């Protein structure tokens, strides 16, 4: 079907008018559109230059804070601190009172008891010098060998209580000293008896607490009529009573 030539011309004219109208609209100012969405804040700018020094301020008010106030109430006790290190050992205390007496112990074995005893007689019949040990040269008994016949001295080897005795025959006055000690023995007792031109028997005894290495012996004095003959013997004896359990 053919289109009329007049219709085509009309269409061309309309297109030309539209183009010219559009061009005229582009030349004239347009109306502002709707504002867009605000953008994100920009990054911080660089620091500005220092400002000028300000003027001096006014003087401040005088404060009274340095004055001490009234004493406050005591605070609450604090928490206990940690346990400190162990201190040094203190001085030794005074001895306590004696304890109660313990029960009686069992019977001991008599065989285990120290056996110390001696007995020696004098067989020498010559004058004994003053200040010298009286010689008892003949050993009768010497359990544990604590008596030395050569020196006529008893030497303590086991500390304890000891009993000593002597029986001396004499013709005239007689005095003897019983001596004890270590390097320098001391006189303990003196036994004397006085008669003239007749036989007599003098005796004496003593209990001593001896320490280890102490000696015991009889010593002659200026009154010395001691004899040692058959029928008129002189004897020196001793034995331990009890050992010292604390030694």
Swiss-Prot record:
Positions bearing Pyrrolidone carboxylic acid: 23
Disulfide partners: 175-192
Gene Ontology terms describing biological process: complement activation, classical pathway; innate immune response; inner ear development; synapse pruning
Residues in the signal sequence: 1-22
Pfam families in alphabetical order: C1q, Collagen
In-chain residues carrying the UniProt-annotated modification 4-hydroxyproline: 29, 32, 35, 47, 50, 59, 77, 80, 95, 98
Record keyword Disulfide bond present: yes
Domain called Collagen-like: residue spans: 39-98
Notes on how activity is controlled: The C1Q subcomplex is inhibited by sulfated molecules, such as triterpenoid sulfates, heparan sulfate, or chondroitin sulfates.
PANTHER family: COMPLEMENT C1Q SUBCOMPONENT SUBUNIT B, EMILIN ELASTIN MICROFIBRIL INTERFACE-LOCATED PROTEIN ELASTIN MICROFIBRIL INTERFACER
Protein name: Complement C1q subcomponent subunit B
Lineage start: Eukaryota, Metazoa, Chordata, Craniata, Vertebrata
